[in-house]
Structures are given as structure tokens and as C-alpha cells.
């Protein structure tokens, strides 16, 4: 029985769930007493979320709401990379949140090395923004999945496994 079992490791998120979470945030901003009249705007573009509001205090409140709604929609808050706060025209502040998606080559190599160092009978290959983990034993693959859960905290990126064969 020389059959190989495998799974893929990706760093991804459900964009529709993110859109739904941001819609809930916009609704809450318009309804909350402390945020009414703050002229807060929330815009989602390809890989960025732009928040513009009157003060840093309001900005921090909006960021907290974004985190809460993302968690409720089963999105990892590790997908958010918060850039520095900019002061724009007048008294307004703006923050850009970059959305992390995909494994870059550097992190993929580190994860691959960590898996191979821990579990000797396993093969890991890098395919673009995904890692393919292969082994003849399903038990080794299950150990690799447990190891990936720990590496997720180490590298501060969301990792998912799919295509388990």
C-alpha cells in the first residue's frame, strides 16, 4: 500500500463573510449613540479597509467593533494588518487596514522547515501561495495539523487546511 495521503495549507478568508461583517459594523455605527454624528466612513477595496472618522477615540471604537463582528462571522482577526494612523484634512483621522491573504515565500519556507524538522516521514512542497503536505501515514498528517495550529500563533497568520486526501 504505497498510497500517499496529503492536504494543503493555505492562508485565506471568506471575502463574503468579511463584507457581511463590515455591513454589520456600518449598521452599528449608524445606530450607536456614542458614534452618531461622528462622520465615520468605512470603505472596503480590494485588499484594504479604509476608516475615516473625527477622532482617535472613535477610530478605536470602530476597530473594536470590526474585531467583534469578524469573530462572530468566524473570521480570524489575524487577517487584519493595522497600518499607522494618519491625520487628514481638518480634524479627521484615517487608518488603513491591510488584509492578509496567502502565504508569502519566506513564511512558507519557515513553516515547511518546521514541519520537516518535527516529523521526519513527511514531504512538504511549496506551490505558489499554498503548501502541500504529503505522507504515507494519516497519523503523520494529523500530527502535522496539530503542529500547524501551534505555528499559527508563532507566525501570527491564519492557517487553514483543505483538500485532505
UniProtKB/Swiss-Prot annotation:
InterPro entries: DUF520, UPF0234-like_C, UPF0234_N, YajQ-like_sf. Signal peptide: none annotated. The keyword Plastid does not apply. Keywords: Nucleotide-binding. One of its GO terms (molecular function) is nucleotide binding. The keyword Nucleotide-binding applies. It holds the Pfam family DUF520. One of its GO terms (cellular component) is cytosol. Belongs to the YajQ family. PANTHER family: UPF0234 PROTEIN YAJQ (PTHR30476:SF0). Nucleotide-binding protein. This is Nucleotide-binding protein PMM0481. It comes from Prochlorococcus marinus subsp. pastoris (strain CCMP1986 / NIES-2087 / MED4). The lineage of its organism: Bacteria, Bacillati, Cyanobacteriota, Cyanophyceae, Synechococcales.
